[in-house]
Amino acid sequence: MPILAMTIPIPPGKTPALEQHLAEARNHPDIDETFKGFGISRETWHVQETEQGDLLMLVFDADDPFTMLQEFSRSNNDLPVWQRQCIKEILGVDLSQAPPAPPSRLIFDWP
């Protein structure tokens, strides 16, 4: 299954708000239906603390990750709309627009 990995800097002091948002998202009644509808089989979010600040690392296992991102950015369903709004408020990233950087490059895969 194709994988998409992304890293986004977390603005100072915003990690608790991000964690709270994800706790709420995890319990959203539409989460399973929404993720499956986008072809996502697994999605993980990780926080890496660094001296330069926290980083959010997202990993998506999806049928077609780039189509999934496009569909997510245009969806009018409750969960994607709410997710985009929260991510914009917390991280300053507008997921209704094209990604601000090119996709990550895979440089090692084992086995």
Language-model regions, residue ranges each:
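Long, hydrophobic N-terminal alpha-helical segment
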Residues: 1-27
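Short, well-ordered beta-strand segments in beta-rich or mixed alpha/beta enzyme
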Residues: 5-9, 43-74
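Amphipathic repeat-derived elements
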Residues: 21-33, 42-46
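An amphipathic, aromatic/His-enriched active-site/gating alpha helix that lines ligand/cofactor pockets
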Residues: 30-41, 62-99
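Short, low-order "capping/linker" segments at domain edges
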Residues: 94-111
